[in-house]
């Protein structure tokens, strides 16, 4: 697998075939769900992750299947996003709604995952870019990718990342997920990413 660095970032950004109408349907389904029922990672006055059932979100399977196909090309082995409807005990995907003034701190994802990713459902202008952190000869190097509606970014699961403050007047909505190679030995802890991997 190639290094995840700024100079080759275009190899990690993709554009799934999902129409504006399909994204609108996803957004509507999210807002019509009980957003307080299944959520986790309460930091800085907001819940980071919202977990919604696969059968309540139209077109979700299509997006996650695409992530698996692209992930295989990157990693060189078959990878999937575990889901309850596929027989796994938890979902390795979650939704993130960042309201105006909110941000996401530095973190990485679960140890067992090989790749992680984000799909942008609705990203208003000035609602925050995704930032990545690499160590270069013991020097911290931070860099960013402009978040754009309809794009998908994959990256190594142990890659530290965060999201800038939402400076817009609208919610920023994205889908996060983890990809695992088969067979999956075990998926530890709760849905999403581990509390111990959050750097605030």
Predicted regions and their residues:
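Catalytic core of non-heme Fe(II) oxygenases with the double-stranded beta-helix
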Residues: 87-154, 158-159, 164, 170-174, ...
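Non-heme Fe(II)/2-oxoglutarate
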Residues: 1-86, 195
């Amino acid at each position: 697998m190639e290094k995840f660095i700024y100079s080759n970032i275009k190899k990690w950004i993709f554009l799934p075939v999902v129409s504006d109408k399909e994204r609108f349907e996803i957004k509507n389904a999210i807002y019509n769900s009980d957003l307080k029922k299944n959520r986790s990672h309460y930091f800085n006055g907001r819940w980071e992750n919202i977990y919604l059932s696969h059968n309540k979100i139209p077109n979700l399977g299509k997006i996650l299947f695409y992530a698996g196909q692209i992930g295989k090309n990157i990693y060189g082995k078959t990878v999937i996003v575990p889901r309850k409807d596929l027989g796994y005990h938890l979902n390795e995907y979650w939704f993130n709604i960042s309201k105006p003034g909110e941000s996401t701190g530095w973190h990485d994802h679960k140890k067992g995952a090989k790749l992680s990713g984000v799909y942008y459902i609705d990203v208003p202008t000035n609602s925050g870019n995704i930032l990545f952190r690499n160590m270069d000869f013991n020097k911290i190097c931070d860099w960013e990718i402009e978040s754009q509606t309809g794009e998908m970014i994959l990256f190594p699961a142990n890659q530290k990342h965060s999201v800038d403050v939402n400076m817009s007047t609208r919610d920023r909505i994205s889908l996060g997920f983890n990809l695992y190679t088969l067979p999956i030995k075990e998926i530890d802890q709760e849905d999403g990413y581990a509390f111990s991997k959050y750097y605030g």
